[in-house]
């Protein structure tokens, strides 16, 4: 997705340090950042924030982190958080490769990856969020019962991710090869998911855990 540059976005985000971490000021203190000590769920690559803000509104007993590196998109997540008055959702504006700088070992209960960039060329495989380098980070920050939820419309990325996770020592608790056909009504659509689905694209989904988190 090409993002149109918003020159004012960075200053806007910096004006809300209570909601947005721009430079790691809360690194290593994620739990303390929230008003209540509750389980932490992360969405990596939140886009415009429809998924994560809907989850946060539905589950006030869970603390959520939206992690998105594009400042020109993050402002839309911030707008939603403010409009909805969410106190259980914070935003990190940084790259996922920095995850273990922000979260302590075992601090996270769930990670969401929704419609991540597939990076289709083989030479870019290490940039995929299900590449083994990222899986190692997820394993480090997830607690013993933690899991990973993954959705995509890209069949190639889905197949790659199944193989990558399996080789890394993960197992799958749920696999949907046509999510919207099998959906029980609990699925929360992202902005892109609705667009892809309206075009007739098949949506793939899985839930996975590590055999040994540590």
UniProtKB/Swiss-Prot annotation:
Residue positions binding S-adenosyl-L-methionine: 43, 68, 95, 117
E.C. number(s) listed in UniProt: 2.1.1.33
Spans traversing the lipid bilayer: none
Record-level Gene Ontology MF annotations: tRNA (guanine(46)-N7)-methyltransferase activity
Entries under InterPro entries matching the protein: SAM-dependent_MTases_sf (IPR029063), tRNA_(Gua-N-7)_MeTrfase_Trmb (IPR003358), tRNA_methyltr_TrmB_bact (IPR055361)
GO terms under biological process: RNA (guanine-N7)-methylation; tRNA methylation
A Pfam family the protein falls into: Methyltransf_4
Active site residues per record: 117
Reaction(s) catalysed (UniProt annotation): guanosine(46) in tRNA + S-adenosyl-L-methionine = N(7)-methylguanosine(46) in tRNA + S-adenosyl-L-homocysteine
Binding positions for substrate per the UniProt entry: 121, 153, 190-193
GO cellular component: tRNA methyltransferase complex
Pathway this chain belongs to: tRNA modification; N(7)-methylguanine-tRNA biosynthesis
Keywords: Methyltransferase, S-adenosyl-L-methionine, Transferase, tRNA processing
Superkingdom of the organism of origin: Bacteria
CDD domains, sorted: AdoMet_MTases (cd02440)
Functional note: Catalyzes the formation of N(7)-methylguanine at position 46 (m7G46) in tRNA.
Similarity comment: family membership: Belongs to the class I-like SAM-binding methyltransferase superfamily. TrmB family.
Classification via NCBIfam families: PRK00121.2-2 (NF001080), tRNA (guanosine(46)-N7)-methyltransferase TrmB (TIGR00091)
Protein name, UniProt field: tRNA (guanine-N(7)-)-methyltransferase
Organism: Staphylococcus aureus (strain NCTC 8325 / PS 47)
């Amino acid at each position: 997705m090409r993002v149109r540059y918003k020159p004012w976005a960075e200053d806007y985000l910096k004006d809300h340090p209570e909601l947005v971490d721009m430079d790691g000021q809360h690194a290593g203190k994620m739990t303390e950042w929230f008003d209540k000590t509750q389980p932490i769920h992360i969405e990596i690559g939140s886009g415009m924030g429809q998924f994560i803000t809907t989850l946060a509104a539905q589950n006030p007993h869970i603390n959520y982190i939206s992690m998105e590196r594009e400042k020109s998109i993050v402002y839309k997540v911030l707008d939603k958080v403010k409009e909805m008055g969410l106190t259980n959702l914070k935003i990190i504006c940084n790259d996922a490769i920095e995850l273990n700088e922000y979260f302590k070992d075992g601090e996270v209960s769930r990670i969401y990856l929704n419609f991540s960039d597939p990076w289709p060329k083989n030479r870019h495989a290490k940039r995929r969020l299900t590449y083994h380098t990222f899986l190692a980070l997820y394993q480090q920050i997830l607690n013993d019962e933690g899991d990973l939820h993954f959705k995509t419309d890209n069949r190639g990325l889905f197949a790659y991710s199944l193989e990558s996770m399996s080789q890394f020592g993960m197992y799958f608790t749920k696999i949907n090869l046509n999510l919207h056909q099998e959906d029980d009504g609990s699925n929360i659509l992202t902005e892109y998911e609705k667009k892809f689905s309206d075009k007739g694209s098949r949506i793939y989904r899985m839930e996975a855990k590590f055999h040994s988190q540590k």
